[in-house]
Amino acid sequence: IVSAGTEVCLVVGGGNIWRGREAENLGTEKTTGDYRGRMATIRNARCLQSFFENHGLVTRVRTSIPVAQCGEPYIRRRALRHLEKKRVVIFAGGIGSPFFTTDTCAALRAKERNCDGIFMGKNGVEGVYDDDPRKNKNAKLIKKITYSELLADNLKVRDNTAVGLLVDSSVDVRVFNRN
């Protein structure tokens, strides 16, 4: 894809391992759990960077929280310059604030860059469904849906903040099973 001239940037997830019930069971408050999740995304970004560079791609990790030895600080114009130079840019640390998901970060970075699309890897689902297919075997795959319909129907393939950011955009989202 990169050799064909496509600018590629990735938003890395991985924070869910520290949030939700697991964090609560450890007595961790939500804010602390979210920051631990941000650090997990930085770790995952470094793993991806190594993998890509071992396969001949030039990459840069940009972090939204300061971790100088692990990645460059996120500065929009510098990230754009890396893309112009045909480098793969890997965004880590979410948007740098608690209570916002990696989905929101992907939507924000896509809008900042005027991206054509987002490929969103989800755990165990092949797309958007009318109900959770892991809980309802009769859930139906929805082939095409607008952001406004996602919000109105309260479908939870991604969080509503991320969907809200994209309502007035032309960014196309494709959901795929990352497993």
Segments and roles (model prediction):
Residues 1, 49, 94-95, 138-179:
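Polyanion-binding loop/helix "lid" in catalytic or ligand-binding cores
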Residues 4-7, 55-59, 84-88, 113-117, ...:
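Short coil/turn connectors at secondary-structure junctions
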Residues 8-15:
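Glycine-rich beta-strand-to-loop/alpha-helix junction loops that act as flexible
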Residues 15-20, 68, 98, 126-129:
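Short, active-site-adjacent cap segments at secondary-structure transitions
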Residues 23-89, 104:
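Ligand-binding beta-strand-loop-alpha-helix segment within the catalytic cores
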Residues 32-40, 44, 109-122, 138-155:
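Gly/Ser/Thr-rich active-site loops/lids in small-molecule metabolic enzymes
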Residues 40, 46-55, 108-116, 165-169:
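Alpha-helix C-terminal capping segments
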Residues 77-129:
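Internal active-site segments that recognize and position negatively charged phosphoryl groups
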